[in-house]
Amino acid sequence: MHKAGFVNIIGNPNVGKSTLMNAFVGEKLSIITSKAQTTRHRIFGIVSGDDFQVVFSDTPGIIKPSYALQASMMDFVKSAFEDADILIYMVEIGEKELKDEVFFNRINKLEVPVLLLINKVDTSDQSTLEEQVAYWKEKVPRAEIFPISALRNFQTEVVFNRIIELLPESPAFFPKDQLTDKPERFFVNEIIREKILLHYKEEIPYSVEVETESFADSETIIHIRSVIMVERESQKGIIIGHKGEALKRVGVEARTDLEKFFGKQIHLELFVKVNKDWRSNARQLRRFGYDTN
């Protein structure tokens, strides 16, 4: 008998969803920073064995959208409810409910298994943890609750084994050697965007999109040309920095991570362009891979 299914991870921003999926997959497929809204897309991470295949789905943190980009991000979360064979609802110690009650109300109405993971228990004491478990048992009575630390890999194997038990009987959805549904250029864009999230403050990181215009792969080196899109001319100057130093730092750090990711030398060219108000432009959002209604 072969088992396979979609295991979709939802939760508020910064609760550890991307860290969890990366831990399960064993590769850094989702970028991770301390900033909210780091994950913008729905990303599949695929784990296959001889008789099973788990398709994990990392999703953007749940927010109440303020503009078209955020609305598109929440559409990715909605789709995670619709095709889940198992839903992982991830919270952190001290957290109370989702930032949007519409999503929270859907959890208790689901017919598929729900695993509620209380993350970051390594930062808590036992009495607080017991209070949290009791609280969530009352709020989501149909969920199985697991205290975990995704960062420390505490209890993640227990959760994974339970997922395997709950998977429906099914053939594999993807080739057994495939790790994700995303193309190489997607990960180039995400790695560059991660460096921008890490090094720039306030609104700048949220006004940025990255597009890879060329990706030329040879036996020993990959030549990459990527464009950092901003919404205003003033943001372009901030991204570039004095004498280009800020952009150079992004390039150096991104190239280092890209070489680790692809396992070969990288020649990376970065450019900055103004794409006015792209976050509210449906055509531009579709161009960057976001669904728009």
Regions flagged by a language model, labelled:
Residues 16, 155, 246:
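Conserved glycine(s) of the Walker
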